[in-house]
């Protein structure tokens, strides 16, 4: 064997060391009582995930109840209720137009009714609405219920910075994991192949296979031929990357709008990845560094998001038009959110409280540009401050 082949095998061994992935096939024990699933949220990504879940609930009748409820914040589209459009035409014409939804996916405008007798809740709403949703759900969700958060962001309050999955667990008393990955919603909805990561820690009160949600059940719930799922336990790792990638993407949008090209975008992503990992090490030491490199929820998601997601588009328009972030968001996103705008403020507030702002110059630069109109052209100097501090 050549020296080059030896090096390749050695590198492969390092990359895969300690990596535990579930296989693409799912071997399941029939549930004693099929799990009833509800998706809370009906935006672009919420509807896409609801489509995936409904397809799998129909495909595994021995494991899941066939009907999937999707809570919809009711709107009127040309005089028709959005829920009625979804339930009769099987399309979300506002947030996911052109995509046919499964007939077992039922839009429900009543939040409390949508979670009646539920076993699994998938949260997929803009994260700023989570406290209000949890407040409404309190007292209506049994402790046996399990949840997955597809939200991107943090909850920052008197208790410090919290993962949104932890916030859900604390507020509702239910075990909650997370789903995150290199997933542009429209591409997933169009059934173009992609990967994602689901993270879930089996709780101490696990009731047993066939009676409770485990990694096999979650694999069956989310895995599709076009949507490949890796199930791991590092909820913190995938949640951190899922939140902070949007802040990095704003930085990429700024330099793109300034016309600085691919080299500048790559520099932002390099610095951003370092700050994401540093944030995890400092504030969530239970997160695993390999998650950032090896999972779809890590560097792959960062690359995809920085290639042209909502945050890049908003930041690019800010740079080219001189408009503020909120004008650009309203103009571009059809009522949806660029989550990085909120996350960068939450991160700034937390870092300021901890006295750690100087350790995260890119995150701070993005915050100052969005909220205090710092000149975008100063980004390189602001980022280089980290090296000065380390010297």
UniProtKB/Swiss-Prot annotation:
InterPro entries: 6-PGluconate_DH-like_C_sf (IPR008927), 6PGD_dom2 (IPR013328), G3P_DH_NAD-dep (IPR006168), G3P_DH_NAD-dep_C (IPR006109), G3P_DH_NAD-dep_euk (IPR017751), G3P_DH_NAD-dep_N (IPR011128), NAD(P)-bd_dom_sf (IPR036291)
SUPFAM superfamilies: 6-phosphogluconate dehydrogenase C-terminal domain-like, NAD(P)-binding Rossmann-fold domains
Induction field: By osmotic stress and by methylglyoxal in a HOG pathway-dependent manner.
Reaction it catalyzes: sn-glycerol 3-phosphate + NAD(+) = dihydroxyacetone phosphate + NADH + H(+)
Binding site for substrate: 152, 310-311
Active site per UniProt: 245
Residues where Phosphoserine is found: 24, 27
GO CC terms, sorted: cytosol; mitochondrion; nucleus; peroxisome
Effect of residue 225 to S: In strain: WFB
Recorded GO MF terms: glycerol-3-phosphate dehydrogenase (NAD+) activity; glycerol-3-phosphate dehydrogenase [NAD(P)+] activity; NAD binding; protein homodimerization activity
Pfam short name (any one): NAD_Gly3P_dh_C
Result, substituting residue 16 to D: In strain: WFB
UniProt record, GO biological process: carbohydrate metabolic process; glycerol-3-phosphate catabolic process; glycerol-3-phosphate metabolic process; intracellular accumulation of glycerol; protein import into peroxisome matrix
Keyword list, A-Z: Acetylation, Cytoplasm, NAD, Oxidoreductase, Peroxisome, Phosphoprotein, Stress response
Principal location listed in the UniProt entry: cytoplasm
E.C. number: 1.1.1.8
Binding site residues for NAD(+): 41-46, 73, 129, 185, 310, 339
Annotated compartments: Cytoplasm; Peroxisome
Modified residues (N-acetylserine): 2
Extra information: Present with 807 molecules/cell in log phase SD medium.
Family from the record: Belongs to the NAD-dependent glycerol-3-phosphate dehydrogenase family.
Function: Catalyzes the production and accumulation of glycerol during hyperosmotic stress conditions. Glycerol acts as an osmoregulator that prevents loss of water and turgor of the cells.
Official protein name in the record: Glycerol-3-phosphate dehydrogenase [NAD(+)] 1
